[in-house]
Amino acid sequence: MWSTAICWLSCISLVISTDVNLYGSMANGWEFVRDLFRENFVQERDTGSSIAIYHQGRLVVDLVGGWFDTSKTKPYDNETLQLIFSTSKSLVAIAAALCVQRGLLDYSELVTHYWPEYGQNGKENTTVADILSHRAGLPDLFVSSFDQYLNWTTMIDLLQQERPVWLPGSAQGYHAFTYGWLAGELVRRVDPQKRTIGEFIREEITNRIQTEFYIGLPQEFEQRVSPLIFTDIEDILNASMLEIYHFHNEARTHQAEIPAANGITNARSLAAIFASLMSNIDERRDSRLLEPRILQRATTLNTLPNEIDITFKIPFPVGMGFMLYEQDFPMFGPNSFGHSGAGGSIVFAAPAKNFSFAYVMNRCSFTPLTINNPRIGMILNRTGRMLDKNQLN
């Protein structure tokens, strides 16, 4: 699991801080990330988490720390996997972009061109772009039981029959769960092998660059998944919302494919995947996933000027499945993109800096993921300043 770090041993410092179970490695000059990351545990902002950074195609920070669960008897280590809620959407967006790159999918094409059954009850003119940029008019879907979320065919049948709550394309409203089934079914339909979205991601993305990301976790990996901790948010959630969150700690949920919300991974893998969208990584010549033109198209703003997202009631700039972060993280230059998830996980890339960052954790918080976030804000602020001054290699 540490082979990538060992490749850079000549310029990487190994870290062992047993008081907070902090382990990992970082390149020379990046030690400040270790120090700030450690403060998350000293100040009890984190229970267990991992953080990783790629710069110029190489892994420069790879750290894990804290505890696997609230019993604090097992370390959170480099074998730990974590459910990341909506950060999962970014991998679905990458899968769709790969299909566009291969000529299998066109963002401007009607969904019915690939999925004829979708064209009913006012959805006939929905485009692929409408689905990927949260404009399809299906931000939510009534289900009689969460068990229905576990059955792909059931969810697709329901979505095919559903009537949109606005004219597709005319407005934007975050599709918290439905995005994954809609986009995932498109990928399955155009894939010559008809793989599920989880299979496609594993075989075309994560296996290719030797990382771990699962939508549909193999049962044998369940013991590696750190349970999410909701102590900090229980008082601000109603009973039904809290039930949804706890549902994501169940093994049956981990093993299903809920692409918008149940991706399971670690920070190292996320940072590597996003780095590989911009360049080859880890000295592997064939590791770049997207051509520059496809990446640019996928990360071009598809939100109208001054548009308010119907779901969030605030502006929410998005491209083709990616959140756009130029306003949230201005220190990393234009065209920064990625996705965050409920509770605090995040991955993003900054093409102007050839930089990618990922953070995942088990202790959930609703603090906004901006430069003022207490867990990652100081790390990102300092990193951005030092990159601007060319003080980091």
What do the PLM-derived regions correspond to, one by one?
Residues M1-W2, Y23, S145, Y174:
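Intrinsically disordered, low-complexity regions enriched in Ser/Pro/Gly/Gln/His and often acidic
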Residues W2-S17:
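Cleavable N-terminal signal peptides of Sec/SRP-targeted secreted and luminal proteins
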Residues I16-W67, E79-T80, A171, R188-N393:
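Catalytic loop of the DD-peptidase/beta-lactamase superfamily, centered on the K-T-G motif
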Residues E31, S90-I94, E109, T126-A129, ...:
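A structural signal for well-ordered alpha-helical segments within the folded catalytic domains
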Residues T70-F177, E185, R189:
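Active-site-proximal loop and beta-strand segments within enzyme catalytic domains
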Residues L138, G180, R363-S365:
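Solvent-exposed loop/turn segments at secondary-structure junctions
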